[in-house]
Amino acid sequence: IEEVFAASIARRTHKIDFISCLEHSARQFVIRRPGDRTEVVSGYPWHGVSGRQTFVSLPGITLEQGHKEDCIDALDTLVREMRDGMFTGNASAAVAADAPLWFFWTLQQLEREVGGKQIWKAYGPAMKDILESYRRGVGGRVALHDNGLVWAAADDIPMTWMNAVIDGRPVTPRNGYQVEVNALWYNAVCYALELAGKHADKAFVKAWESLPARTQASFVELFRLPEGYLADFVGTDGPDKSTRPNMIVACGLDYKMLDEELQLEVIRTVRQHLLTPKGLRTLSPRNLLYKGSLEGGSPAERDFAGKNGSAWPWLLQFYVKACFDIDRDVFLPQAREILANFDEDIQSYGIGSICELYDADPPYASRGAISQAWSVGAVLNIHSMIRERTQEEARESKTAGKAAKAVKPVAKSIAKKAAVKKTATDNMPKKTAAKTAIAKEAAEKKSAAKKSAEKKPTEKKPAATKAATKKTKTGK
């Protein structure tokens, strides 16, 4: 009992500022169930548990507060229930093509806390099973094609996070190769290969090592548009050119298929069309389907606007990471501004938390669930990225300062030696100065004697010597 009490006290947060309020809110999403189950409630007051949102939320709502055990318990709950190499329920690729791939992204964040060895030991079998399931195909809806890309399609079931349905039909039909699904697929395969290579799983490496290059080549070929950004999906009718935020995921993962030039084009497009102070719009305002507000209207109209305009905070973490990866510390002021934009929200709508989504048009009114797990997790994740970059900037500045200080003593030493040399005689001890004066006087006397000797008349040679000299000159 004492241990439970101590653990409970340790988990308490003091709501004294913006971040501490969000940390307190984050604790409320993690639920302990009977039977050693740990789940993540997607949002309050009406959302339940979602596999996709669990994976996306976990790093921000657990790891950023130092509660890695909660993250591990939630993952273990889902892994224990896997069947035939796949998660069950709404975490299955059969109904959510991207959900199992977010599992790999979550593990990448967890690795920073526990190390790659522990990740591969605990979750390597599940990772390999999931990849094999995609290779075999899932539920007749998800398949890995020969070009290395994942195809997901279902007539009446939206297979991605844009899953609103009106009258039994998806609001945003995206059957085909979805941009974020395939970005996550590439990231998952590369991450599994990295861990397998480090921990001597030669069989897995041999079976999968040729796939990433094929996936990357196909992705760039199919998704890159002449306009510079990425298609939202590529279906039977070709690429869909709607400007949507899903392409930013391809720039915000650890393993990317895009070169720096294409990443910049994607970031520029997102910044120009989709970025708001509260999140990324789900559609460009230039699109005829765009809806800037959820105000009024029927539930169907609000569902339509939610995926055709409304701004979602959870996407911002991938935009911020993508910008940091390209601009590094130069992006810090903008990242701080993005974080500060949510400060006022904890005093309205969902007190002390971040809501599900916002209107895409000013004044960006709060909408949806008053407290959403992946919104809170994303903002806390952004805060963590800013903190890490700030610390790195401080270390670099400190290192540069030490280097500058190291140069100054060298310059001073050189100047000092020159000054010492110049004033050496003045600074000599008296005995040394006296010895120098005596030596100087002796040298002067020696020089005077030499000059005196040179002034004496030259001694005459004997006559025989003169004759010999003359004979030598004439040669006779």
List each language-model region with its residue ranges:
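Acidic, mature catalytic/reactive cores of soluble proteins
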Residues: 1-417, 422, 473-476
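Intrinsically disordered, polybasic Lys/Arg-rich low-complexity tracts
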Residues: 398-476
